[in-house]
Every structure is written in structure tokens, then in C-alpha cells.
């Protein structure tokens, strides 16, 4: 019934099993990947024909996590999985990026890659098995695909590279790098690091590419035994006559357009050229008695012509699109404290790219609780990236963030994360929001720069500024040029774009997408060195604007006071059913967070109210000391004395013989319920019961005359 084929290979410390032929047999290709109890099913289906008028490659990649993989039932009312999580979105992008360049030019059939996580070992992230599975499913499907690819995660522990480290090992690793590529070329890199040098980062890329050959070889073996016949597909023949006609009609206009340095004016000129060429081609066809050529085909020819013009200008040493040379960063403008009520804000402008980044400080209660498949955790640092359509002078949909926005936000977050102060040094939750108000390339790196500035403006004690720069590469016939701070057009027309963020010390985030084969280690070394040069230039501009973190928080940011109590006293602060802490927060207008170790953090915009809450907590948790004098209150009267509260929740017996220096016949003659009295603690037994005395400090008659000894004062101690 089943024709199951299995291949096993050793991959670092893990054994990886590839299986096909048993599950999802109606898909074009399906592979089950197992790595130490983490199991993913990767499937691919391709349409046999492209849709009419299709002018781009419609690849869809969906990575899907099911809670049953971790032995859990989804929360919520419906008890089933809902919209994709951020992890699912980011992993889908991670798989998409190295696969997309390997489909042949002109292949416009719908292709859908779906990866389900069926079982998860919390120590092994499913993303690498998912990438290997997607590559294997495509390779055995027969769909036109210039793969397979391999993928590897690389850590850096104790000065050594580690292949596919576990989640536990990553906690002590200075690098978390994912690299994907073919046998001969690296295609994609995604990494975060703790200020490592360019040499170490590049070494990690090379190490990962070398090690992934084991996965690529296993996929080749699987294809040999279980691969389907290759599709009989050929790209549509090029219309050389149309190409020549379009080139002749457009060359002069396109050359003129790319002499215009300002983006909007250049875009307007390009639209005019496109419209004029379309009209000219239609007119020529009409004169020849033929139908007008396909407008999509004409546009594609024009785009290829644009690419040749821009690339040849750069390789021949001519100025770039906006007039710069290959190493110059666009002019930078920085303004701080832009928003009066925000806790911190920065407007970072680099050429025609602009980011308004806003920092907001919150309490532990504002942390994001993430119910991840590999285990729930709390996140005290959030970075949200938004790019509305007006940033590029366009109209469009406004709504939930798209995959691109989520990916850019994650990259910027990775860049800034290593510089955050430890939670014990800065207990605030931090949220950064990057609003892209203009975009012409490198908006994610503008978010990094603006985010670093906004945090310092808010008083977050980061150790150093973090800057980011987007780089590009043009490679043709052995000649190459590395471009610093690329424009949007250079991104589309180039062969590699990579983003590098970090401090003067080293790299904190690296993202690389390579669109062609033939890029050597030496070219990447040049590119990384040039990126460092650009990054240091930007860091200098940022330091000129703000040397270091502000010493004072915004007046609108919450103030935090920290006290430490005996953990056994926590119940006294919370009270029965939470009544005590609820009353405390409502009456003082504060937020109070209590840790199991007895650490209490009080937060309030009003520092006076925070100190009042602190005082009351100290009272609630103070220990009564024998020999100390306290201001108390009579709770109730007894025939033989009174019960007096000396501290919140602590009371003792005041015997009738310890009230005055004379004999009292009736307790009601000297005390009333609610009456304030000053008492001395004269005894505490092993059960914590207190004996009190007024006589020991002069007697009730002295208090009534106003000459009583003062009570002890408890001073709250803030950490």
C-alpha cells in the first residue's frame, strides 16, 4: 500500500530522518522530517498551468504549528488554532527567502509550500527541520527548482562554532545564526549576536554552509530513490524583435530618468517613459496590422532594461541613482524628544528614508506573555514596525501588520536586544514603535538607529548606540561593486542585499539575501568591511546628537520603588482573597508586582503615591520587636484588659494591670474602642502572641497629659 523511502543522516549532535511515501501522497511532494522527537511534515503542490496574465512568481510558504505537537489544547473559547503567531510568520519568511531565487525565471505557476509541526521537543526548534523538509519536498516533486538547499543553525560557545545547538545551548551562545544555501552558494543568513566581529560572523556563515552539505547529500539520495519525473516545462521563448523595438524606444528616456536624483521626480519620469513606450508599441503593431503586444511583457522588458542601465553605470564607476559613490551614506538628520508626552522619541532621517521611533516604559505587568509551542515565556522588550502606504507616496490597505512588517520589526529588535540592561538593573518593560513616515530603502535599519536613540532619550541605560546599514552588491562578468546604504531601486536591481547592525565593538544582527550564485567568501569579506565603515559613520552622527542615555526619566514615565520583604510575609500584603493588595493599589493609584522571593516593585507616575504605598507595605510586613514602643489602636475591650493593634495585622493583649500606675476597677473608665494609645511590647511568646504595656512607659495618665515617650518609627527601605 505504501512505498515508503527513508534516509537518515547525522547532523551535528542530532540524527535526522527523512521519510516520504506514506503521508500526504496526493501532494506534488511530501517529506516527514524527524529530529529527536521534533517532527514536521513538509508538503508542496504546484499548479500545472500559470494563470492568464500572470507576471510574477506566486510562491506561498506557510509554516503552521499545532498545539497537539506539545501535548496541549489551545486556549480561548473555540479551542482551536487561530491566526498565525509571530513565530509562524517569521519561520514562513525564513523558509521562503532561500527557496524563491531557485525557481527558474519565467515560471509563474502557483506553488504552495505548507509545513506542519506535528511533534516538538522543547530543546529542538522546528525551523531547521522545516527548511530541510521544504527543500526535500520540492526536490522530489519534479517541479522546476534549482535546488535542493540545506539549512543549519550555528552557535558560538567558548570560542567554538556549534552546529545546530539546542535551545539550552543557545542560552550561553554569543551567536544564533541560521544559514541556508545550495551545494555551491550561500543564499540566506539570519543572525543575532552579542557584538561579535565581522570575521567571527563570516566564519559562522562558512561553517554552516560546509556542515549543511550532509543535509543536501541526504536529499539527493532521497530524490534518487523516491523522486518524481521532472516536469516538461520550458520558459516561453523571448520575442527578440519586441525586445529590440522596446529597447530602441525606451533607451534614451530611461537614461534621462536615471539622471534625475530625486525619487519622486524620477518615478514620475519613469512612468511617463513606460506609458510612452506602451503607446509606441501599440501604434507600431496597429500599423503592421497586428494586435498590440502584451503590456506585461513590455513592462518586463523595460524593467530588464532599467536593471542593465543602473548596473552598468555602477560597475563603470559612474554615480549611483541619487548621485553618490558606492561608499557614501546619505545625509542624516536626527531630532530627539519629538513627542512631548512620550517617554522617549527620535526622528531619524537618512536621505529619503525616515523613521519616527517612540519608546514607552511600563511595568512587569505590561510584559508580553507568549504562549509558544516550545513553552510559555514573558517578553519585556517589544519592537513594532509599521509602514503605512503614504511612506512611499501610495495608497493601500491599513490594518493588521503584514509579514514584511513583522519581519522588519523582528530584525530591528534583534539588533537592539544585546544592549538592553539586565532586568535587575532596569526593571521597566520597554516598547518601541517605529513609524516609517518616508521610505526609499533601508527602513528597518532606520528603525534600529531611531530605536537606539529613542531608548536613550527615554533614559534606558543602554551601554552604547546601535546603528544599522543596508548594503547591496552588483556582480557581473567578474566585476563587482558593493553599495553602502542602498536605495529601494538598488535593492530591487542588485544581486545581494544584506543588513548589518551593531555597535563600534561588533555586530548584533545580520540579515543577508543573495539572489545569484558565484558570490565568494572574499566578496562577502569586502562587503562586511564596507558595512562596518558605514556603520561607524552613522554611529558618529548618533553620538553627536546624544552621547549617552539621559540620567532622568520622562516626567510621564512611571516611577519604580523596590523593597524586599520576608517571603513569608507575602500573604500579609496580598490579604484574604487579594483584598489587601487590591485596596492598596486602588487607594494609592499604583501598580504593585510581588515576586516569590519577596521582591516587591511599586510603580506609579506619582512618586508621592508610590512612597505612600511603600510605607504601607513596610507597615504590613514589619516585625514587632520586644522593647519597642508603638502607636496602636484599641480593637476591642475585655473584662481583664484590651486588644490593641500595634501594626497592620499584628495585635496584642494589654492587661488591665499594665494600663495605669493605679488600680483600675472598670476598663471602660480609661479606654474606648478605636482610641489611639502608645504601648510598649514587653513580651512575645513562641507562638508570636504579644503582651503590651502602657504602664512601662509612664501609664495612661501620662499619655492623657501629653508627656508620653515617643513611639519607634519604621523607615521604609528602597533597594
Swiss-Prot record:
Its EC number is 2.7.7.8. Keywords: Cytoplasm, Magnesium, Metal-binding, Nucleotidyltransferase, RNA-binding, Transferase. It catalyses: RNA(n+1) + phosphate = RNA(n) + a ribonucleoside 5'-diphosphate. It is found in: Cytoplasm. Residues 558-617 form the KH domain. Mg(2+) binds at residues 491, 497. This is Polyribonucleotide nucleotidyltransferase. It comes from Bordetella pertussis (strain Tohama I / ATCC BAA-589 / NCTC 13251). The lineage of its organism: Bacteria, Pseudomonadati, Pseudomonadota, Betaproteobacteria, Burkholderiales.
Amino acid at each position: 500500500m505504501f512505498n515508503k523511502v527513508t534516509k537518515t543522516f547525522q547532523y551535528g549532535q542530532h540524527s535526522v530522518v527523512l521519510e516520504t511515501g506514506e503521508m500526504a501522497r496526493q501532494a506534488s511532494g511530501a517529506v516527514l522530517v524527524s529530529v529527536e522527537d521534533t517532527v514536521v511534515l513538509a508538503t508542496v503542490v504546484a499548479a500545472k498551468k500559470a494563470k492568464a496574465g500572470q507576471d510574477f512568481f506566486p510562491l506561498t510558504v506557510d509554516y503552521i504549528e499545532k498545539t497537539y505537537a506539545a501535548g496541549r489544547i489551545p486556549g480561548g473559547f473555540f479551542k482551536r488554532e487561530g491566526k498565525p503567531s509571530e513565530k509562524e510568520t517569521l519561520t514562513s519568511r525564513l523558509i521562503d527567502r532561500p527557496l524563491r531565487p531557485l525557481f527558474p525565471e519565467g515560471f509563474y505557476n502557483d506553488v504552495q509550500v505548507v509545513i506542519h509541526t506535528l511533534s516538538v521537543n522543547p530543546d529542538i526548534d522546528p525551523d531547521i527541520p522545516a527548511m530541510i523538509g521544504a527543500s526535500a519536498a520540492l526536490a522530489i516533486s519534479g517541479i522546476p527548482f534549482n535546488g535542493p538547499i540545506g539549512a543549519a543553525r550555528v552557535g558560538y560557545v567558548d570560542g567554538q562554532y556549534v552546529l545546530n545547538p539546542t535551545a539550552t545551548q543557545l542560552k550561553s551562545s554569543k551567536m544564533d545564526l541560521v544559514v541556508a544555501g545550495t551545494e555551491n552558494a550561500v543564499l540566506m543568513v539570519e543572525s543575532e549576536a552579542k557584538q561579535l566581529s565581522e570575521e567571527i560572523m563570516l566564519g559562522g556563515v562558512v561553517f554552516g554552509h560546509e556542515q549543511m552539505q550532509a543535509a543536501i547529500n541526504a536529499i539527493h539520495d532521497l530524490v534518487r530513490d523516491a523522486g518524481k519525473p521532472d516536469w516538461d516545462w520550458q520558459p516561453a521563448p523571448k520575442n527578440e524583435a519586441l525586445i529590440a523595438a522596446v529597447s530602441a524606444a525606451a533607451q534614451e528616456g530611461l537614461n534621462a530618468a536615471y539622471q534625475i536624483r530625486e525619487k519622486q521626480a524620477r518615478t514620475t519620469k519613469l512612468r511617463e517613459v513606460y506609458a510612452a513606450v506602451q503607446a509606441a508599441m501599440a501604434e507600431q503593431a496597429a500599423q503592421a496590422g497586428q494586435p498590440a503586444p502584451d503590456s506585461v511583457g513590455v513592462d518586463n522588458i523595460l524593467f530588464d532594461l532599467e536593471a542593465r542601465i543602473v548596473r552598468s553605470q555602477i560597475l563603470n564607476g559612474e554615480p549611483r541613482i541619487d548621485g553618490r559613490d558606492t561608499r557614501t551614506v546619505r545625509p542624516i538628520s536626527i531630532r530627539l524628544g519629538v513627542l512631548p508626552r512620550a517617554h522617549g522619541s527620535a526622528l531619524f532621517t537618512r536621505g529619503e528614508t525616515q523613521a519616527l521611533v517612540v519608546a514607552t516604559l511600563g511595568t512587569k505587568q505590561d510584559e508580553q506573555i507568549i504562549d509558544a509551542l516550545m513553552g510559555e515565556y514573558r517578553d519585556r522588550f517589544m519592537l513594532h514596525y509599521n509602514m503605512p502606504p503614504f511612506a512611499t507616496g501610495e495608497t493601500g490597505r491599513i490594518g493588521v501588520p503584514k509579514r514584511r512588517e513583522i519581519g522588519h520589526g523582528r530584525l530591528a529588535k534583534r539588533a537592539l536586544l544585546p544592549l538592553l540592561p539586565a532586568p535587575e538593573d532596569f526593571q521597566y518593560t520597554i516598547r518601541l514603535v517605529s513609524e516609517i513616515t518616508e521610505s526609499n530603502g533601508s527602513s528597518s535599519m532606520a528603525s534600529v538607529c531611531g530605536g537606539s536613540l529613542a531608548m536613550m532619550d527615554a533614559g534606558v541605560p543602554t551601554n552604547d548606540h546601535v546603528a544599522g546599514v543596508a548594503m547591496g552588491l552588483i556582480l557581473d562578468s567578474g566585476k563587482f561593486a558593493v553599495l553602502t546604504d542602498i536605495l529601494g531601486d538598488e535593492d530591487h536591481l542588485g544581486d545581494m542585499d544584506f543588513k548589518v547592525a551593531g555597535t563600534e565593538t561588533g555586530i548584533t544582527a545580520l540579515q543577508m539575501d543573495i539572489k545569484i550564485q558565484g558570490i565568494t567568501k572574499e566578496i562577502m569579506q569586502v562587503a562586511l568591511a564596507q558595512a562596518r565603515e558605514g556603520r561607524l559613520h552613522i554611529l558618529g552622527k548618533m553620538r553627536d546628537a546624544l552621547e549617552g542615555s539621559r540620567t532622568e526619566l520622562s516626567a510621564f514615565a512611571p516611577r519604580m520603588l523596590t523593597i524586599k520583604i520576608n517571603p513569608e510575609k507575602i500573604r500579609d500584603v496580598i490579604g484574604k482573597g487579594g483584598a489587601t493588595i487590591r485596596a492598596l493599589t486602588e487607594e494609592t493609584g499604583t501598580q504593585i508586582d510581588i515576586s516569590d522571593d519577596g521582591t516587591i516593585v511599586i510603580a506609579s507616575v506619582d512618586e508621592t503615591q508610590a512612597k505612600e504605598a511603600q510605607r504601607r507595605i513596610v507597615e504590613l510586613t514589619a516585625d514587632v520587636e520586644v522593647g519597642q514602643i508603638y502607636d496602636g489602636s484599641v480593637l476591642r475591650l475585655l473584662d481583664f484588659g484590651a486588644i490593641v493593634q500595634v501594626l497592620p495585622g499584628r495585635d496584642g493583649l494589654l492587661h488591665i494591670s499594665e494600663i495605669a500606675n493605679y488600680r483600675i476597677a472598670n476598663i471602660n473608665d480609661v479606654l474606648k474602642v478605636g482610641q489611639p494609645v502608645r504601648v510598649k511590647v514587653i513580651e512575645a511568646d513562641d507562638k508570636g502572641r504579644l503582651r503590651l504595656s502602657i504602664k512601662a512607659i509612664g501609664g495612661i495618665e501620662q499619655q492623657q497629659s501629653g508627656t508620653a515617650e515617643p513611639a519607634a518609627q519604621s523607615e521604609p527601605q528602597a533597594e
